[in-house]
């Protein structure tokens, strides 16, 4: 790839193409990161709501960039007596498409760290990249699902609130409901006691579990508790179609980065990885999803659990 000057940058500043793990002549010597990339999708299962639903088979898998015809009026069957007329049904379809989305996580570490990396160090880098990709995935996934989702007022009873959510979302016998909560809400459900002092929901832990047979997932991107109370999201995985590509991990010792969590556009002060004896590690993930039934998601707010 020919280096190209970034927009708004002076002629002395050029963009450097990143080396990839599959290029032995460039960044393939960072062989340890092949292990990180290989384990990404499996490890994301416990970090990301999207990946958990995907791994469980709750989300119907459709290839990315696929044109969809979504049935909005289902056909109905009838019992027909001998010699009787057979009712004819009509259907309605809505056109949609499974567009691809991209999330990335970028970190920079010194080469001294890489050269002296132990298994614990590699695990740390893997954890940071995994967490970044998982958080960005759920931010896109839950943010899109909640944009037009119906909201239900909560109460003091988790079971009553779950029942109200199920009445909205789980309208078919083949539904695959998942309850998504924030970490503090998971803590509250885990430690909630009955009037006799016993754990109200033995299947719950701070990292998730289940309530009344419904899997509970924990995400930083779920509605956080506030002065009005706790919140939660009930998602029917069967109302979602989607797909995901493999997470790619790239490394470059020659990139020039704007070391900021909120990078600005235009000409900026860049830091050379080569000059600072550092390496940039970039995790990239392409995925997509589409809610094909508007009642497939419901939000709970103001619960006093």
Predicted regions and their residues:
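Alpha-helical scaffold segments that mediate packing/assembly in large oligomeric complexes
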Residues: 86-88, 93-176, 192-196, 299-300, ...
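Assembly/oligomerization interface modules of large self-assembling protein complexes
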Residues: 3-103, 163, 296
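Short loop/turn segments at secondary-structure transitions that flank enzyme active sites
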Residues: 74, 113, 135, 139, ...
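Short helix/loop capping segments that flank catalytic or ligand/cofactor-binding pockets
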Residues: 70-79, 116-118, 188-191, 290-292
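Extended oligomerization regions of viral-like shell subunits
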Residues: 151-279, 285
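Protruding loop/beta-arch "assembly-hinge" segments enriched in small, turn-prone residues
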Residues: 2-18, 24, 49, 269-305
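Structured loops at beta-to-helix junctions and adjacent beta-edge loops in soluble globular domains
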Residues: 65, 69-71, 110, 182-184, ...
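A broad, low-specificity signal marking well-ordered, structured residues that form hydrophobic/aromatic
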Residues: 60, 65-66, 98, 105-107, ...
């Amino acid at each position: 790839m020919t280096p190209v000057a970034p927009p708004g940058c002076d002629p002395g500043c050029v963009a450097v193409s990143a080396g990839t793990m599959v290029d032995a002549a460039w960044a393939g010597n960072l062989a340890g990161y092949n292990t990180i990339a290989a384990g990404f999708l499996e490890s994301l299962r416990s970090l990301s709501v999207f990946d958990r639903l995907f791994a469980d088979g709750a989300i119907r898998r459709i290839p990315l960039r696929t044109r969809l015809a979504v049935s909005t009026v289902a056909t109905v069957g009838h019992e027909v007596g001998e010699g009787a007329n057979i009712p004819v049904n009509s259907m309605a379809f809505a056109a949609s498409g499974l567009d691809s989305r991209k999330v990335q996580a970028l970190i920079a570490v010194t080469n001294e760290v890489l050269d002296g990396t132990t298994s614990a160090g590699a695990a740390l880098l893997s954890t940071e990249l995994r967490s970044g990709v998982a958080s960005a995935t759920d931010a896109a996934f839950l943010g899109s699902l909640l944009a037009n989702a119906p909201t239900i007022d909560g109460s003091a009873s988790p079971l009553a609130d779950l029942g109200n959510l199920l009445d909205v979302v789980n309208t078919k016998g083949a539904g695959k409901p998942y309850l998504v909560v924030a970490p503090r809400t998971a803590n509250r459900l885990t430690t909630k006691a009955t009037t006799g002092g016993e754990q109200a929901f033995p299947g719950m832990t701070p990292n998730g579990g289940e309530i009344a047979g419904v899997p509970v997932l924990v995400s930083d991107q779920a509605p956080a508790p506030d002065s009005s109370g706790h919140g939660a999201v009930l998602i029917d995985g069967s109302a979602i179609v989607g797909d995901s590509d493999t997470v790619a991990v790239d490394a470059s010792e020659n990139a020039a980065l704007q070391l900021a969590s909120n990078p600005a556009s235009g000409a900026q002060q860049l830091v050379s990885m080569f000059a600072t004896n550092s390496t940039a590690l970039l995790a990239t993930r392409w995925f997509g999803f589409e809610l094909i039934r508007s009642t497939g998601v419901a939000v709970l707010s103001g619960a006093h659990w």
